[in-house]
A protein has these predicted regions:
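Iron-sulfur cluster-binding electron-transfer modules in prokaryotic oxidoreductases
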Residues: 1-179
Length: 179
């Protein structure tokens, strides 16, 4: 049904917010002969900023850390666009505080492994371990580029008692609030 609609409306390009949809549309659909240009919203936003189509104000003074979504980063190799976006909204470029495990070595939030839908009975939950890494950066804000990662980071924030101390955002929110 999707393919029929793509053909009916002559769809050539799709922009996704969800990294899992990015993978499905870009890779899986290509395997069955569907030719589409598929990009993640971080690529679009970074391109709009680079080409001065949008100009967010650099108003964030707090330190911020970025969680690389597995399906944007390791599966598609996109690490620069989200960081370029963050640099565009930070007053000081040194306010971006990387977690020790970032980019190619980033640690999964757990959503892709199904941890969002069940309760771990023993050991530390993956999203809590990842959120503790965010806490250790000293940042007051955590940004990501995946709807599932946001859910996991929000849960990690609550479990670690950081509800009042830290905020979780999608990178698009940070830009939208500043244009």
């Amino acid at each position: 049904q999707n393919i029929e609609n793509f053909e009916k409306y002559n769809v050539k390009k799709i922009i996704t917010q969800c990294p899992h949809c990015l993978t499905t549309l870009k890779n899986d659909y290509a395997e069955i002969g569907v030719e589409l240009e598929v990009i993640h919203h971080s690529e679009l936003i970074a391109d709009l900023i680079k080409n001065e189509k949008i100009q967010p104000e650099a108003t964030i003074e707090d330190d911020i850390t970025f969680h690389d979504a597995c399906y944007v980063g390791r599966h598609h190799g996109e690490y620069d666009a989200p960081r370029q976006i963050l640099q565009s909204v930070l007053k000081d470029s040194s306010s971006l505080k990387e977690m020790p495990r970032n980019k190619e070595q980033s640690f999964c939030c757990g959503a892709g492994g199904g941890n969002m839908w069940y309760e771990i009975k023993q050991g530390k939950r993956i999203n809590v371990e990842r959120f503790e890494e965010a806490i250790d950066t000293g940042a007051k804000k955590v940004a990501t580029s995946c709807n599932f990662c946001m859910i996991m980071m929000e849960d990690g924030k609550k479990v670690t008692g950081q509800d009042k101390n830290m905020e979780v955002f999608d990178i698009a929110e940070l830009v939208a609030e500043r244009i």
